[in-house]
């Protein structure tokens, strides 16, 4: 399951559990992005903090694990590299790449997207009521197997990382939106605090 996880929340965990059940997956590997190329216009929490929050959030589920492949690779994170690395580490595994359905809307702009479908099946998870306009995607993928791309609706995805960050900036509680250990980590590390306003000095 790929994502920025900034921070990871219960929606991510429920989605992973639901997909694991529906597709009978042995394991769900969470892969925090290193440097998300599509989010260069906003501040992203340090990779190590996002990795540790993901470890904390997934620790109690023996079916979940966390990979550092994107964080340790360096440079901008592209899904094609993520899948190549995971395939090299697990050459005999049937890979499913779980991501937000909204991200799949732009999949044809991803680097080497054709190659990615030869490595893994894609599962897009969405909040209730979200509709993916997939006509252009379907046209491009018509030569691929019918199960190359699946969509799964997950009610808990009404929670979003951006809302969690906004609440933290405003000193509002994020309890029960993210796992307890993540709340404690965010507090201890003082993540998502407002950026200090530069002090302006009047010339004397």
Curated annotation (Swiss-Prot):
SUPFAM superfamilies: Nucleotidylyl transferase (SSF52374)
EC id: 2.7.7.18
UniProt entry keywords in alphabetical sequence: ATP-binding, NAD, Nucleotide-binding, Nucleotidyltransferase, Pyridine nucleotide biosynthesis, Transferase
General function of this protein: Catalyzes the reversible adenylation of nicotinate mononucleotide (NaMN) to nicotinic acid adenine dinucleotide (NaAD).
Presence of keyword ATP-binding: yes
GO BP annotation list: NAD biosynthetic process
Catalytic activity: nicotinate beta-D-ribonucleotide + ATP + H(+) = deamido-NAD(+) + diphosphate
Disulfide bond positions: none
PANTHER family the UniProt entry points to: NICOTINATE-NUCLEOTIDE ADENYLYLTRANSFERASE-RELATED, PHOSPHOPANTETHEINE ADENYLYLTRANSFERASE
Name of this protein: Probable nicotinate-nucleotide adenylyltransferase
Family of this protein: Belongs to the NadD family.
Annotated GO MF terms: ATP binding; nicotinate-nucleotide adenylyltransferase activity
Gene expressing this chain: nadD
Pfam families in the cross-refs: CTP_transf_like (PF01467)
């Amino acid at each position: 399951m790929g994502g920025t996880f900034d921070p990871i929340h219960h929606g991510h965990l429920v989605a992973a559990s639901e997909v694991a059940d529906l597709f009978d997956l042995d394991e769900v590997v969470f892969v925090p992005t290193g440097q998300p190329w599509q989010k260069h216009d906003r501040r992203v929490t340090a990779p190590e903090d996002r990795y540790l929050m993901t470890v904390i959030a997934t620790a109690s589920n023996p079916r979940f694990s966390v990979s550092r492949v994107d964080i340790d690779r360096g440079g901008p994170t592209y899904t094609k590299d993520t899948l190549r690395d995971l395939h090299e580490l697990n050459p005999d595994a049937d890979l499913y790449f779980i991501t937000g359905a909204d991200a799949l809307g732009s999949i044809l702009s991803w680097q080497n997207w054709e190659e990615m479908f030869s490595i893994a099946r894609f599962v897009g998870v969405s909040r209730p009521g979200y509709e993916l306009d997939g006509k252009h995607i379907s046209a491009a993928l018509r030569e691929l197997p019918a199960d190359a791309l699946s969509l799964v609706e997950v009610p808990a995805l009404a929670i979003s990382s951006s809302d969690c960050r906004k609440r933290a900036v405003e000193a509002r509680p994020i309890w029960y939106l993210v796992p307890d250990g993540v709340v404690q980590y965010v507090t201890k590390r003082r993540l998502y605090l407002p950026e200090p306003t530069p002090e302006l000095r009047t010339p004397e």
